[in-house]
Structure formats: C-alpha cells, structure tokens
A protein has these predicted regions:
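Conserved beta-strand/loop positions that form the S-adenosyl-L-methionine
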Residues: 87-89
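Flexible, active-site-adjacent loop/turn segments at secondary-structure boundaries
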Residues: 52-53, 61-62, 91, 158-161, ...
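S-adenosylmethionine
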Residues: 6, 105-108, 112-230
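Residue-level signal for pocket-adjacent positions within structured domains
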Residues: 49-50, 91-93, 205-207
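Conserved SAM-binding loop of SAM-dependent methyltransferases across substrates and taxa
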Residues: 91-104
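Class I SAM-dependent transferase core
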Residues: 1-85, 115-118, 122-131
Length: 230
C-alpha cells in the first residue's frame, strides 16, 4: 500500500488506520532498510489487525516491545538460508516478523483459521514477501500440511500450546536433527521439567533455554530449543 505516512496502512476507502508507535532506532541499526518493512507490518497489526480481532487494541501501545521485538529476536538463532515453519502463526508472530528482516529465509506460516490466513495473505502481498513466505491454511497435524511443509530445518511457535502438545504437532514437520524453537516466557524451565519424561519418549534432545535479542528487548526473548532425534 502506498500513499500513507510511514507506520500507517490506508483503508480501502483511503483513510488511515490506527497509527502504531514509531519503531525504535535499534531496529534500523540492526536491520537497516528491512526495518521499514517491519514498521509497515506493525501498521497492519495496529490497524486491520485490531479491527479484525487479531490483536487487542490495548496491545497497540506496547506492540514493539511485547510482540515485534520479542519475535524478531528469533532471527539471531537462524542460519543463512534456513527454512522455518511457524505453527499456529495467528497474525504472523513470530514468523512473519522474522521474514520482514531476513529475506534469506524460506518461511511457511501455518494457521487453520480463514480470517487469519486472509490477513496474512494480504500482508505478505502488500510487503512483497511472496517469493520467500508462504501462507498455509491448516493445522500442523493435518496430512495436507505435512505434505506441504514437512522436513523443515526449524519449527517455531509463540503462545500456541503447552510444550507437550507443541512437540506432538511440530516434530512430524521437522527433518531428523531439525530444531523446535519455542518462544516461552519465565516459565520455560518449569515446562521442560514438567514434560521431561514425555520429551524423552519423543526422543527430543533438550538443548536448553536460550535468551536472545538482549540488545533489542528487555527482558530478552526466551526460547526453548529442542532437537528431533535422528
């Protein structure tokens, strides 16, 4: 969409949606011009995203620190040219946020709800990300989804499900030796301890809890790293 000020998304009728707070300077220092794509995505979340019920209006003032910076911190853990599947992508967090700043990645956004996949498809088209981002409608456990996105190097998820369910859904999508990078909060270690026996049965190698993005967001993003056994 063109013609609006940075950080806003014009409606179809021409008026502007809710403006998002300006992006922090650190974003441009880290990601250069790609940060502008993330700012446009932020405007989609603050405008159409809130109108369609994908993001609560009260989240708009803290959109950067609570949602976007928390998500793009994941980029630090992904090697060049990696293939990433975002399970239960919702409004695109974290997968679409990461795709905005990492054009080298191949990203699949897996989401079962039509209103969410419609939103994701519109944003991907508007930001011209279609060459390296796909929107896949379905549940992670669906055979059709497995056929499309299986054998991934990395699967990620944010605020989707407890760790045991997330492993059940995501491990079939991973190649042997592939990694689940689950964004979790302060309870990450407790979840690992709670599901220790289940993870052993699933032959999940626990690599621990990684803190990343300390220069972007405080507190840093906390990621549970599990590897599918070979």
């Amino acid at each position: 969409v063109t013609g609006g000020r940075p950080g806003s998304v014009p409606e179809r009728g021409g008026s502007e949606q809710t403006a998002v707070p300006p992006p922090p300077d650190i974003l441009f220092r880290r990601f250069g011009p790609r940060a502008e794509l993330l700012a446009r995505y932020a405007a989609w979340l603050a405008g159409p995203g809130t109108v369609r019920g994908l993001l609560g209006p009260r989240e708009v003032p803290r959109l950067w620190e609570r949602h976007l910076l928390n998500s793009v911190a994941l980029a630090d853990l992904l090697p060049d040219g990696a293939r990433l599947v975002d399970v239960g992508s919702g409004a695109g967090l974290p997968g679409l946020a990461v795709a905005c700043v990492r054009p080298d990645l191949a990203v699949d956004l897996v989401e079962p709800l039509l209103r969410r996949t419609d939103f994701l498809t519109e944003v991907v088209a508007d930001l011209a990300l279609g060459q390296h981002v796909r929107v896949v409608r379905g549940r992670a456990e669906d055979s059709a989804v497995l056929d499309k996105v299986g054998s991934a190097q990395f699967v990620t998820a944010r605020a989707v499900a407890p760790l045991d369910r997330l492993v059940r859904w995501s491990f079939p999508l991973l190649r042997p030796g592939g990694s689940l990078l689950a964004l979790k909060g302060t309870g990450a270690e407790d979840e690992l301890a709670e599901h220790q026996q289940f993870l052993a049965r699933m032959r999940a190698e626990v690599r621990g809890v990684i803190e990343c993005g300390a220069e972007l967001v405080d507190p840093p993003t906390r990621v549970v790293h599990l590897v599918r056994g070979r």
